[in-house]
Amino acid sequence: TMLSGDIPKNKSVWYQKHMAHHIFDHSNLEWTKDVVNCFLIRNPKEVINSYIKRFNLTNALQLGYKQQLRIFNFLKNSTGQTPVVLNAKDVLMNPKSQLQGLCAKLGIEFTVDMLSWPSGKRDTDGVWAPHWYSEVEKTTGFQPYSYSNTTLEDKWSEIYKKCLSDYDLLNSFRMKP
């Protein structure tokens, strides 16, 4: 298939970013067994505060935690293997160690070149670039973890609670720093 066929352009790695909120309850997940999966998670409080700056948030499904956990459990139960889980905070607090660990788990050679990149837009950024990547486009490497908005307005508490239990479960499987 287009998602799990031959790797394009004779590359050794074919990275695909999938957004879990696009996976519906009726979606067939069998194709996920044909690729190596890695789950990148982030604290729901941080996600909510970021998301509401750009989009109207009406329910927890928009953030994808339930769907991410569904995919994770499907893979764990159907393959007998625990998929790799990375916490974004851990990556930002120690990018080299986290990327070395990720590469080791995925069978990819780590190089220090993975820790930096040229600033600017990329052909591979896709349709979401204008919505999410403006800050990333200014960077040349991982920025130190910084989260100053530790509060969450009360109106988001229900959505936060719905996401938190799924996040906590996924986080319990994260690759430790």
Model-found features: residue ranges?
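Active-site donor-binding segments of glycosyltransferases and PAPS-dependent sulfotransferases
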Residues: 1-13
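Membrane-anchoring alpha-helices and their flanking helix-loop junctions
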Residues: 13-19
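PAPS-dependent sulfotransferase catalytic domain
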Residues: 19-113, 127-134, 138
